[in-house]
Amino acid sequence: MKFALVLLGFCAFYLVNATGDLETELEASDLQELQEALDLIAETPLESLEAEELEEARKFKFPKINWGKLASKAKDVYKKGQKLAKNKNVKKALKYGKQLAENLAAGEVHEPGTPVGNNKCWAIGTRCTDDCDCCPEHHCHCPAKSWTFGLIPCSCQVTESDKVNKCPPAE
């Protein structure tokens, strides 16, 4: 609202100054009306405008928060999280994620292509096609079926009790 009044006043002031050379062509009454409009804008108290804005701000109310309902939702989410933490598949995914994060952060035990024994092996997390690409103590793990090839590629992983490297030893 203030901005509109200031803009109107500025435009009116510009018109008065721009038409100053043309005073002779304009009638005195038109100039008088324009001058009165400028005076009216100048006399409008900004305090009344601020009071209106303050009144509107007072009328605005923040939504009430039901803290009990919020706490019960938080408790439900916590319980669901604990159930998920007990899930066998989630545990495996968490273990895989932790292993991957550790390998990315700490670096690898074996650099890609480094000979280990008679085999050349690739670092943990490196893409692989079969167990022979990985070190003897690692295996090539494919987390998804072949239709996701490229999206979730196979990679060398630490060998667990249920997974073994099936590549025949190098001669």
Curated annotation (Swiss-Prot):
Has antimicrobial, insecticidal, cytolytic and cytotoxic activity. Residues 59-104 are annotated as: Linear cationic cytotoxin domain. Residues 118-171 form the Oxytoxin-type inhibitor cystine knot (ICK) domain. Belongs to the spiderine family. Cationic/spiderine subfamily. Keywords: Antibiotic, Antimicrobial, Cytolysis, Disulfide bond, Knottin, Secreted, Signal, Toxin. Expressed by the venom gland. PROSITE patterns: OXYTX_ICK. One of its GO terms (molecular function) is toxin activity. The keyword Iron-sulfur does not apply. It comes from the Eukaryota. Residues 1-18 form the signal peptide. GO terms for biological process: defense response to bacterium; killing of cells of another organism. InterPro entries: OXYTX_ICK. The presence of a 'disulfide through disulfide knot' structurally defines this protein as a knottin. The N-terminal part of the mature protein (59-105) probably forms an alpha-helix which acts as a membrane-active peptide. It is necessary and sufficient for the toxin's antimicrobial, insecticidal, cytolytic and cytotoxic activity. GO terms for cellular component: extracellular region. It is found in: Secreted. Disulfide bonds join 121-135, 128-140, 132-167, 134-156, 142-154. Residues 19-58 form a propeptide. This is Spiderine-2b. The lineage of its organism: Eukaryota, Metazoa, Ecdysozoa, Arthropoda, Chelicerata.
